[in-house]
Amino acid sequence: MVERTFSIIKPDAVERNLQGEVLAMIQGAGLKVVAMKMIHLTKAQAEGFYAVHRERPFFDSLTTYMCSGPVVCSVLEGENAISRYREIMGATNPANAAEGTIRKKYAVSLEANSVHGSDAPETAAFEISYFFNALEIVG
């Protein structure tokens, strides 16, 4: 089934200028970039995006980190895009990520793990609409 998912290349990867490498891995896995923008999140934007984690102990640290530098947001499209992108990303904790995944190759730590990706169709829909309107998505 062709579906869309949402991706963020996080501040640690952008700071190291890894956007090209990450996008090459994504496209190499057969996913198509149908929308993309680079932004510097405000604290309020990060808190709104990660609102589902508001009660978690890592919420403040995560939202502060996500505002620490520019990020690259994109909408990816392809067969089983959500599960395929999650496979390419690797485990949240880079120590547990499989060889050849984005997080195994590029993550610095559990928090600075280089990428974010939607985990379900409902979250993909929310996350895509949080950063993009329909006119910004081509495909």
UniProtKB/Swiss-Prot annotation:
It is found in: Cytoplasm. It catalyses: a 2'-deoxyribonucleoside 5'-diphosphate + ATP = a 2'-deoxyribonucleoside 5'-triphosphate + ADP; a ribonucleoside 5'-diphosphate + ATP = a ribonucleoside 5'-triphosphate + ADP. It holds the Pfam family NDK. It is an enzyme of class 2 (transferase). Its cofactor is Mg(2+). The active site is at H116 (pros-phosphohistidine intermediate). Keywords: ATP-binding, Cytoplasm, Kinase, Magnesium, Metal-binding, Nucleotide metabolism, Nucleotide-binding, Phosphoprotein, Transferase. ATP binds at K10, F58, R86, T92, R103, N113. GO terms for cellular component: cytoplasm. InterPro entries: NDK-like_dom, NDK-like_dom_sf, Nucleoside_diP_kinase, Nucleoside_diP_kinase_AS. Disulfide bonds: none annotated. SMART domains: NDK. Its EC number is 2.7.4.6. GO terms for biological process: CTP biosynthetic process; GTP biosynthetic process; UTP biosynthetic process. One of its GO terms (molecular function) is ATP binding. Major role in the synthesis of nucleoside triphosphates other than ATP. The ATP gamma phosphate is transferred to the NDP beta phosphate via a ping-pong mechanism, using a phosphorylated active-site intermediate. Belongs to the NDK family. Homotetramer. This is Nucleoside diphosphate kinase. It comes from Nitratidesulfovibrio vulgaris (strain ATCC 29579 / DSM 644 / CCUG 34227 / NCIMB 8303 / VKM B-1760 / Hildenborough) (Desulfovibrio vulgaris). The gene is ndk.
